[in-house]
Amino acid sequence: MSRNAPNGCVPPSQATAPPSPATSLRLTVGEPVSEPATESGERVLQDGFWEHGRFYGSWKPGKYLFPIDKEELNRLDVFHKYFLVARDEKVTSTPLRKDGRPKIMDLGTGTGIWAYNVVEEYAKDAEIMAVDLNQIQPALIPRGVTTKQFDIEEPSWDPLLRDCELIHMRLLYGSIRDDKWPHVYRKAFEHLAPGIGYIEQLEIDWMPRWENEDLPRHSALQEWAQLFQRAMHRYHRSVTVSGEATRRRMEAAGFTDFSETTIRCYVNPWSPDRHQRECARWFNLAFSLGLEAMSMMPMIDKLGMTKDDIVDLCSRAKKEMCILRYRAYCTL
């Protein structure tokens, strides 16, 4: 698909991802091979299983409820591009040192694209540990970056980097058990450099709101968000975002000097503002690519829905997202 789709929206049958803005990251799903990487640097996934038409990781099954196939990795890279556009091309808002070799951890790194972006364009001498439950990062990585397969719900973080100037987390709601968040923040606090360390977390509230009073009579997007929240709540891995609750948890872990920024993630480019339209195009693409991936395991396992029901719901939600008079947005 071209960068600018018709009306800036993604037809449900044509949702494909553009090239990633930094390192090209791709996943090849195939039979096990003796070497972990191909000549092109693509990683061949060896451990996992197919379910509901998608490929899932098999290390600690049930902890990460979303697929790790090529389509999903493309979606994660598109979301990275959206975050860059929405935040004025800033890969982080943390004031990192330009001299020396700052230590950074990226928790829930996914494809690793954020970590690679930091070391290639922002802090070239940084030492970065990119941590994830799944080994879905490419075999060829920039100098200064190491990848680590690790479950951050584990009691001990001894294998992880210490004295960090920044610990970065993004889109981890739904991946961490509700009762484990205090532990995650406490361990993050312990692994930051005293007096100079920062934690930075970005989450999206998927429940749509509307800019005006022109609302769909029966919103498929709202129905999807309600069902998704309900299913994830039954896993005790909530995706309901509360800045106040997050702040209380961080304060209890020892953090101080908070800064919170809210950005509206418009689902289509209705705005006359050029930057808002560009943001909306990328968010529409990323959201459209992810609807079914986010839905299949939770809604089938916890709500008893069928795959056909979910495909129909997601298709209706995608179509609604492309109607420009419905000025819906999520919040970042």
Curated annotation (Swiss-Prot):
The keyword Transcription regulation applies. GO terms for molecular function: methyltransferase activity. Induction: Expression is negatively regulated by protein kinase A. It is found in: Nucleus. Keywords: Methyltransferase, Nucleus, S-adenosyl-L-methionine, Sporulation, Transcription, Transcription regulation, Transferase. It catalyses: L-methionyl-[protein] + S-adenosyl-L-methionine = S-methyl-L-methionyl-[protein] + S-adenosyl-L-homocysteine. SUPFAM superfamilies: S-adenosyl-L-methionine-dependent methyltransferases. It is an enzyme of class 2 (transferase). It holds the Pfam family Methyltransf_23. Residues 1-23 are annotated as: Disordered. One of its GO terms (biological process) is methylation. CDD domains: AdoMet_MTases. GO terms for cellular component: nucleus. Its EC number is 2.1.1.-. Its main location: nucleus. It comes from the Eukaryota. Disruption phenotype: Leads to a complete loss of expression of all seven cellulases, auxiliary factors for cellulose degradation, beta-glucosidases and xylanases. Also affects the expression of 50% of the GCN5-related N-acetyltransferases (GNATs) present in the genome. Methyltransferase that performs automethylation. No other methyl-accepting substrate has been identified yet. Component of the velvet transcription factor complex that acts as a global regulator for secondary metabolite gene expression. Required for the expression of VEL1. Regulates expression of the carbohydrate-active enzyme gene clusters, but does not act by directly modulating H3K4 or H3K9 methylation. Required for conidiation. Component of the heterotrimeric velvet complex composed of LAE1, VEL1 and VEL2; VEL1 acting as a bridging protein between LAE1 and VEL2. Interacts with VEL1. Belongs to the methyltransferase superfamily. LaeA methyltransferase family. This is Secondary metabolism regulator LAE1. It comes from Hypocrea jecorina (strain QM6a). The gene is LAE1.
